[in-house]
């Protein structure tokens, strides 16, 4: 018989840097999860992705055990890394802050493909291009 799901917790945590401090600790404590167990597992699983923000979906069961699934980093984080900027534009229609090439967009789309609701890479590229434009980036090519 399958375990009954008690709660689902969604967080975005820097890769390899989960700690019991806020915001991770309180969110997991409310769900009744062993915080140290989660942080060790998460940090081990994401050690190779240092510097990126990793979304994680934690499924908590009634017996207080848990499973978690890490997703790919948000498109905005990958775009900022590709463009080499700290943050997007506050006025994306008038103030362009960076440029990304279509090759960079394709690479990001291929990385994000498993988490996007897209039929093929071209559709995923259009989604990533839209995100880039809304951040004040110019897409070349």
UniProtKB/Swiss-Prot annotation:
GO molecular function term, any single one: large ribosomal subunit rRNA binding
SUPFAM superfamilies, per database record: Ribosomal L11/L12e N-terminal domain (SSF54747), Ribosomal protein L11, C-terminal domain (SSF46906)
PTM text: One or more lysine residues are methylated.
InterPro entries the record matches: Ribosomal_uL11 (IPR000911), Ribosomal_uL11_bac-typ (IPR006519), Ribosomal_uL11_C (IPR020783), Ribosomal_uL11_C_sf (IPR036769), Ribosomal_uL11_CS (IPR020785), Ribosomal_uL11_N (IPR020784), Ribosomal_uL11_N_sf (IPR036796)
Alphabetical UniProt keywords: Methylation, Ribonucleoprotein, Ribosomal protein, RNA-binding, rRNA-binding
Alphabetized Gene3D superfamilies for the sequence: Ribosomal protein L11, C-terminal domain, Ribosomal protein L11/L12, N-terminal domain
GO cellular component: cytosolic large ribosomal subunit
Keyword rRNA-binding: yes
Transmembrane helix among keywords: no
Record GO biological process: translation
Function: Forms part of the ribosomal stalk which helps the ribosome interact with GTP-bound translation factors.
Family to which the UniProt record says this protein belongs: Belongs to the universal ribosomal protein uL11 family.
Protein name: Large ribosomal subunit protein uL11
